[in-house]
Amino acid sequence: MENLTEIESTMESLTEMESERVEQGTDKEIGSGEKRQDDVKETENENSGERVGEEAPVREHEDSPCLIVIEEGTSLASLEEVTNADDLPKIDDEKNSQFETSPHPSPSPSVALDTEEGLINPTAEDTVEENIVSSEVSSDILKDDGDAVEVDRDTAEVQEETANIPESKLSEDTGSPHHHADILMVQEKAAEEHDMIASGDHEEFPVNPDNKHSEENQSPHHHANNVMEQDQAAEEREIISPGEHKEIPANPDTKVVEENNDRIDEGEANNLNLAGDGSGAVDHDYLTKTELDKVLEVPGSETISKLEDRPSEHLSETSMNVEKELEMPAVEILPDNDKNSDVLAVGVSGDSDNVVSVLPASQTSSDRDEGMITVDAEPTEDMKLDVPDSKLVTDTTVDSTNNKDAHVEANTERQDNSSALVLNDANNESAPVKRVPGPYVASSNIKSEARGSGDLNNGVHKIVRTPPVFDGTMRAKRSFLLDDASDGNESGTEEDQSAFMKELDSFFRERNMDFKPPKFYGEGLNCLKLWRAVTRLGGYDKVTGSKLWRQVGESFRPPKTCTTVSWTFRGFYEKALLEYERHKVSEGELQIPLPLELEPMNIDNQASGSGRARRDAASRAMQGWHSQRLNGNGEVSDPAIKDKNLVLHQKREKQIGTTPGLLKRKRAAEHGAKNAIHVSKSMLDVTVVDVGPPADWVKINVQRTQDCFEVYALVPGLVREEVRVQSDPAGRLVISGEPENPMNPWGATPFKKVVSLPTRIDPHHTSAVVTLNGQLFVRVPLEQLE
């Protein structure tokens, strides 16, 4: 009660001082009062649409031409006396000085008394709720009274002027229990909202941009309000973003009416404007930036994820005038208080997509008019990304063509379309930041610092994608093999020749083999040219079978005194390049067509004498029998050589004359020809079947005479000990071969062929002969009938 008594005495003294000032300034404010009254009504209409989640504004009294409020300390009985009075225009100026303006909420905090006197110091949200409750109480009292209060224009102007005191408190009947309950509810709600502000989850209420303040030097109450406003504004700035924001200047629409500058100087007025407590209009973009910056500055891992948890109506409060919002700069660059601190610049565009760009603290953006941020960064080889504590899965895409742009997309389990990390190269200054809605980042340890050396921050994880390096094998593919089709350029450059020799040296060293570069007439041989010449002709086997070594040797322009060109260059290739060729073919790096004829594939240097003799014998055996030739239809025709000899003998007989010896030869030849023609008719009954893997390289031909079957077979590379012949009386002849060395140079493999003869045979008198040339002759006599 003592506090209430002191309050009433203070209010009476203030009322007297205000009434004196009002009487002096009434004539001056008549013209401006009308304009301000219209501004108050327009502000009420605008603010009623901006409030989200608040109670509906209290409607005006039907019979009242202006807004009616009551003074603090005025009871219901006194109000009835004033209402029932006949002389309404003569309302006391002392009471008019305490009238409030409109029932719409004012965002400025109401600080009428100090907290030391026992009352709670409410915040900006407290004032909003308190104004709404007070307006409802005032409206209920006026409705119960039922009488309209009419005030003439002069008195209305005085009320309008005195209502502009920013920190005046809505007066209610202090003795009413209803009022006391309202005060308790307001205090509890203020405490809850104060906790919400401290936790960073409160809503920002837009400030009326048309508020006008009338300041006076004679009101100690007003001076106290200014001091409390500054203290409370400082506390709000510390809650929202401690030490990170610029002082936002007041909007040009704010007007401060100062009549006397004796007690309140210009500095206090500037502090009132800079306090940001409702004394001036604040830009909607600033509110949006303030909300997002508060979320971004929460310490720990909640730095960016707070954006996702905020409801959508927060942004809707600040988007009343979208066109005006789009005209403002979309990005605010905050000052860097510390060169080592990281600044996250947030841009809010018209499509409500948030783009979070990582901007080093030492850099600022000059593209405010374009609504974009150009981030300077080093090339991607030096780019480092520090993500130590998150569930972040980073997918880095590096453009290999220019190796400049790197887009880092961060993927987490929580998906959201609000933000994406974008890094642009410093060389592409004119390129805008890509605004791609991407996955949400749940970590706060994503930093990008600018250093004097040009590197980004010294993070742990370094994302670098280096181009593939060609090793020796790939280089051999490119320069040693792929250029072999170009005629006239088989020699290659000196660098290619040196690289190829190094390749050969490493190849032999890996296999513990000696490699001596060949020399031709005292000079080093161009092995690269020899390699390309042979591989272009089809490889070693093809060149050997086609007898193209002389052609290969002639490309080196040997002297005319060299009479062994073919043998010399063939030896060079066998010693230096043959093993290398076999390796390339086995690895699939060199494609050489298989030879059409079965030719020797390799030569052992250790057994050059016997091996070459055996190889030559096999080659001659493959050329076919001189006595017989098998046609494509399976018939056996007369051998060309015998026919040729027969013709020669006949010519000689005509020239020389008939002699007994020539007649014998002639008869024998004629008999053989007739016998061969006779046997050819029965060859259709002979079948040859492979048992096991097919061996097409083994050729078998069968002829029938009067008393036996003659079987001619080609088994190149096999000797007598490696060939086996079996027969049975039913007419089956089995020819099998088993080479001693499976890795023989002729490619001979184990085989087994069954020849089915049309008649029964005598297996006890069957004989076989194998020559050194790989020819097999088997004589199978017919079964003798007794």
UniProtKB/Swiss-Prot annotation:
> Could you tell me where this protein is found in the cell?
Nucleus
Q: Where is this region: Disordered?
A: 1-182, 199-251, 395-420, 606-638
Top-level taxon in the UniProt lineage: Eukaryota
For this protein, the record's SMART domains field holds:
ARID, BRIGHT
Provide the taxonomic classification: Eukaryota, Viridiplantae, Streptophyta, Embryophyta, Tracheophyta
Q: Name its species.
A: Arabidopsis thaliana (Mouse-ear cress)
Q: Where is the composition biased (Basic and acidic residues)?
A: 18-64, 87-97, 141-156, 169-182, 199-219, 234-248, 402-416
Q: Where is the composition biased (Low complexity)?
A: 1-16, 130-139
Question: Which CDD domains does the entry mention?
Answer: ACD_sHsps_p23-like (cd00298), ARID (cd16100)
Q: Name one Pfam family in it.
A: ARID
Any keyword Nucleus?
A: yes
Protein name, please? AT-rich interactive domain-containing protein 3
Q: Does the keyword DNA-binding apply?
A: yes
Q: What are the GO BP annotations of this UniProt entry?
A: regulation of DNA-templated transcription; regulation of transcription by RNA polymerase II
> Cellular component GO terms, alphabetically?
nucleus; protein-containing complex
Alphabetized, the UniProt keywords read: DNA-binding, Nucleus, Transcription, Transcription regulation
PROSITE patterns named among the record's database cross-references: ARID, SHSP
What region holds the sHSP domain?
686-786
Q: ARID domain spans which residues?
A: 494-585
Q: Family per UniProt? A: Belongs to the small heat shock protein (HSP20) family.
Task: Extract one GO molecular function annotation from the record.
Answer: DNA binding
